[in-house]
Amino acid sequence: MAAVIKKVGVIGAGQMGNGIAHVAALAGFDVVLNDVSADRLKSGMATINGNLARQVSKKVVTEEAKTKALSRIVAAEKLDDLADCDLVIETAVEKEEVKRKIFHELCAVLKPEAIVASDTSSISITRLAAATDRPERFIGIHFMNPVPLMELVELIRGIATDDATFEASKEFVAKLGKQVAVSEDFPAFIVNRILLPMINEAIYTLYEGVGNVEAIDAAMKLGAHHPMGPLELADFIGLDTCLSIMQVLHEGLADSKYRPCPLLVKYVEAGWLGRKTQRGFYDYRGAKPVPTR
């Protein structure tokens, strides 16, 4: 029998975390949004408020629904505040050692029957589950960015994930109004296994001088009908995240076709991470984005 999920914890108040809190609260779940940084919590709550206000202005949700959703979210700086959650979703930086540390500390305070999930975009669910005291109640729930707008959620079972956890997680995602894509536990799952090598190839195309930033993005938008060019999309995702996923693919599948482009590595080393640092393949510090190469 699938567990009943009523209260959801979200670890990390950044772009993914506040997005998950937003859709969960709007769907009627009580939410505890956790972050060790008070500033990030404040910023995350402000983002949720702003995004809900935008949905009201577009008549996607009512003012009443917005007010109720905000009333369901509690901001918390301590993991102890997640103790009675039925499901906790981790959205920390895409570094395995960071996630494992969070899970170790979380499981020390979380009720035994609760489900633990990771929003990881590439890391093995089986390995992450091994850092917990409940591998059978551990699962990957990978949302797409931006969470309030994107309809797909990847659901990934680890080797020990039991049927009750899978069914409860699947039901939770359905209540959010999202479509489930079930993926096996292989590096980067489905979406990023396909998407990130394309982005990496676009970066190689720039690195090798085949085309400049504008030409590459225009080629894919106008020639392949993509809504965003691959370099623009890389900046949106975050170049550090792109690099982490390519490294997981390269190490996990041992195939040279997944080798991260040296230019991607150089940008990350320079701290040019895309939109979040105002510089990446585009410079966002002016009135409109300008290609950096």
Curated annotation (Swiss-Prot):
It comes from the Bacteria. One of its GO terms (biological process) is butyrate metabolic process. Keywords: Fatty acid metabolism, Lipid metabolism, NADP, Oxidoreductase. PROSITE patterns: 3HCDH (PS00067). It catalyses: (3S)-3-hydroxybutanoyl-CoA + NADP(+) = acetoacetyl-CoA + NADPH + H(+). Pathway: Lipid metabolism; butanoate metabolism. The keyword Lipid metabolism applies. It holds the Pfam family 3HCDH. The keyword Oxidoreductase applies. Its EC number is 1.1.1.157. GO terms for molecular function: 3-hydroxybutyryl-CoA dehydrogenase activity; NAD+ binding; oxidoreductase activity. This is 3-hydroxybutyryl-CoA dehydrogenase.
